């Protein structure tokens, strides 16, 4: 369950008559009401208090209804479904005094809803967030997919352990221009960049990083969490500067490359291993694995040589391929 808190402010006051705290502040004057979602569920009783020293002449409205919902400094709302959520406003004499927005977070059969993001099902089911790091600097990128294109808002926070909840900072989520097709359906891809402030590339990780994405679609709130060690999400950039050198009196060529600029240094400590493969029009040769940055291969006409990299000492993900034409 999401950490719960009851926030009291001078701008608006949200009270609960339920003995279990089931409402908390997402941002200023925006509150999430957590609901058990089943037929005839009792819902949650929420008491809204208008931010004004006045006691008389106050009326309440909602963006869900054209009617006046009540009068007085407080309004009691029984929140059972999305029709009970939305923005509540108190007025006096045509003047808006304060507003409170109620969002719903559904729980069905003890499980929080996950309707907004696409389950990518890799490396396991319920994998909504994917994260990668190009090196051990503490910088990483996360992304997720959604079929929803409007009325959508994301916020991201991250930490490594409870002792330093602000030790990892994340920027704003941005919509990628990349089109992602899954099962003949197009999805929007969102990405976010994060950085651990006190990262030590050579240090052994003892606590995982946790990333939480909060998603709001219309009046629905959901959150998604991914927990990992940087070493488990490493995916180097492809090797750079691939070059071919013909060998005298031989059908072979020497292909050479360099470490990617983004990889951690020194390379004597942060070492990579490489995979080399000749790829023709109709077939691919077997892969060669090596630690050095050159190899001798037979390069056929109209073929290409491709090289990828991964961490030599830890079973990281392989990089994308870098390639050079034989012709």
From Swiss-Prot:
Q: Which CDD domains match?
A: FN3
Q: Where in the cell is it found?
A: Secreted
Q: What SUPFAM superfamilies would the database entry show?
A: Fibronectin type III (SSF49265), Immunoglobulin (SSF48726)
Q: Which PROSITE patterns match?
A: FN3, HEMATOPO_REC_L_F3, IG_LIKE
Cystine pairs annotated here are 50-90
Pfam families per record: IL12p40_C
**Protein's name in the database:** Interleukin-12 subunit beta
Which residues are modified by glycosylation?
A: 223
Q: What does this protein do?
A: Cytokine that can act as a growth factor for activated T and NK cells, enhance the lytic activity of NK/lymphokine-activated killer cells, and stimulate the production of IFN-gamma by resting PBMC. Associates with IL23A to form the IL-23 interleukin, a heterodimeric cytokine which functions in innate and adaptive immunity. IL-23 may constitute with IL-17 an acute response to infection in peripheral tissues. IL-23 binds to a heterodimeric receptor complex composed of IL12RB1 and IL23R, activates the Jak-Stat signaling cascade, stimulates memory rather than naive T-cells and promotes production of pro-inflammatory cytokines. IL-23 induces autoimmune inflammation and thus may be responsible for autoimmune inflammatory diseases and may be important for tumorigenesis.
The residue ranges of the Fibronectin type-III domain are: 238-327
Q: Which organism is it from?
A: Cervus elaphus (Red deer)
Of the GO CC terms on this record, one is:
membrane
């Amino acid at each position: 369950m999401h950490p719960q808190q009851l926030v009291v402010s001078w701008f608006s006051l949200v009270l609960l008559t339920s003995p279990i705290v089931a409402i908390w502040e997402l941002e200023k004057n925006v509150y999430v009401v957590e609901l058990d979602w089943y037929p005839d569920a009792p819902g949650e009783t929420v008491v809204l208090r208008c931010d004004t020293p006045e006691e008389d002449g106050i009326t309440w409205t909602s963006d869900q209804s054209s009617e006046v919902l009540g009068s007085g400094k407080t309004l009691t709302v029984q929140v059972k479904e999305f029709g009970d959520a939305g923005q509540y406003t108190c007025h006096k004499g045509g003047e808006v005094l304060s507003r409170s927005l109620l969002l719903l977070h559904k729980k069905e059969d003890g499980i929080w809803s996950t309707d907004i993001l696409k389950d990518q099902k890799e490396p396991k089911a319920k994998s909504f967030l994917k994260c990668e790091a190009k090196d051990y600097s503490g910088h990483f990128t996360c992304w997720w997919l959604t079929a929803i294109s409007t009325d959508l808002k994301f916020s991201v926070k991250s930490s490594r352990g409870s002792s330093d909840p602000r030790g990892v900072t994340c920027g704003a989520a941005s919509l990628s221009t990349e089109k992602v097709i899954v099962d003949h359906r197009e999805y929007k891809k969102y990405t976010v960049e994060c950085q651990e402030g006190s990262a030590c590339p050579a240090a052994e990780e003892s606590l995982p990083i946790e990333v939480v994405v909060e998603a709001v679609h219309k009046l629905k709130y959901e959150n998604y969490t991914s927990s990992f060690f940087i070493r488990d999400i490493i995916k180097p950039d492809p090797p750079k500067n691939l070059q071919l050198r013909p060998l005298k009196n031989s059908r072979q060529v020497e292909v050479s490359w360099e470490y990617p600029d983004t990889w951690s240094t020194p390379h004597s400590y942060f070492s990579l291993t490489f995979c080399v493969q000749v790829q023709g029009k109709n077939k691919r040769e077997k892969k060669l694995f090596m630690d050095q940055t050159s190899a001798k291969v037979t390069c056929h006409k109209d073929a290409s040589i491709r090289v990828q990299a991964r961490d030599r000492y830890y079973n990281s993900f392989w990089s994308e391929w870098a390639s050079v034409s034989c012709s």
